[in-house]
């Protein structure tokens, strides 16, 4: 069984930061990520939104032709940029000596983590566990998610088409930025 000083569950911005900091201080570190390095921040959240807004606002980017937006080309560029960012984070972790395991990490005790990956299940021993698994969007009890009509924030960039109309619930920073993103593409967002 492999053994580490620290196991970090989650490879989003918090998990990667914790893993790099621990490795810089001399700890033997393993990071366990259920999906892709970068977590929600890079693949579902603010990064794709900021990249998309940047491309739409930059007239020389070629994504906004007098009000016509090639949404397929735009989403392809966003996806490519996100993959590059994920690879850069993965490279930085490797350079710092952090071991990466892809799978779902389940703490079995304060010193043992079970990793469930697609093809196998294995245990890893550790002295400490850092949980940085982030969050996931919740639906409003009276308005459940219907993937074609009511879309959680995590799924906004999965569909590479632009709807005719958008109604955004939530006015935090992400909701306001998302409203700007759609406003620039369809001319209205509520």
Predicted regions located by residue number:
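N-terminal Rossmann-like FAD-binding beta1-loop-alpha1 element of flavoenzymes
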Residues: 4-31, 167, 175-184
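Residues that cap or flank secondary-structure elements
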Residues: 10, 80-81, 170
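Glycine-rich flavin
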Residues: 20-27, 32-164
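Short secondary-structure boundary/capping elements
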Residues: 148, 173-174
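Conserved mid-sequence domains
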Residues: 151-154, 171, 181
């Amino acid at each position: 069984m492999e053994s580490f000083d620290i196991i970090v569950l989650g490879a989003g911005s918090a998990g990667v930061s914790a893993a790099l900091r621990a490795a810089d201080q001399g700890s033997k570190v393993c990071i366990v990520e259920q999906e892709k390095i970068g977590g929600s921040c890079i693949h579902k959240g603010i990064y794709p939104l900021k990249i998309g807004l940047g491309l739409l606002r930059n007239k020389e980017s070629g994504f906004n032709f007098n009000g016509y937006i090639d949404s397929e080309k735009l989403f392809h560029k966003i996806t490519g940029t996100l993959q590059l960012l994920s690879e850069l984070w993965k490279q930085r972790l490797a350079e710092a000596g952090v071991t990466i395991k892809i799978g779902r990490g389940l703490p079995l005790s304060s010193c043992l983590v079970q990793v469930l990956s697609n093809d196998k299940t294995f245990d890893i021993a550790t002295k400490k566990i850092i949980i940085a698994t982030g969050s996931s969007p919740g639906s409003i009890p009276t308005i459940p998610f219907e993937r074609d009509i009511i879309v959680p924030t995590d799924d906004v960039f999965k569909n590479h088409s632009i709807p005719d109309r958008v109604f955004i619930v939530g006015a935090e920073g992400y909701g306001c930025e998302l409203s700007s993103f759609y406003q620039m593409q369809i001319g209205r967002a509520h």
